[in-house]
Amino acid sequence: MPSFLEPSKYCSWLSEGKLAMQAKKLEKGSSRDTITEVYRFVSTKFNYDGEKAAQLSGTRGYVPDPEETYESRKGICFDKASLMCAMLRSLGIPAKLVVGTIDGVSHAWVSAFDGDKWMKCDPTMGGWQDESEYVERYEL
């Protein structure tokens, strides 16, 4: 599980940066409550960037920058999932950045460990979605 706690190419943050400081403000008594707070924050405070999605459509190799997403307050699904993942990991909560499809469309979401089980969180779609719609390709 250590790899789901560490910064990575797709889920990085500055330990003294604004993203980590904001995550600390959202921390609650339990991992589950903290996951819920971070999820709510990312899903409600960050807009979906349709223009960016159109520009990146059909391209490969995009690497999200959670710190940039935090500053701009917008991003595509990969950005929002990467941001949520980075915020949770900065608090010591294991989190996976998951890439796959939902209803046949490329998508990214988060799977976070609450101490008992992995919780699927989709900060782009704004809900705890029906798991049957998600097809996981890989975790980062």
Which sequence ranges carry the predicted segments?
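Secondary-structure boundary elements
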Residues: S8-G75, L83-C85, F113
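Hydrophobic/aromatic-rich core segments of domains that either
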Residues: D79-L140
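Beta-strand-enriched, solvent-exposed domains that form extended recognition/catalytic surfaces
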Residues: M1-F4
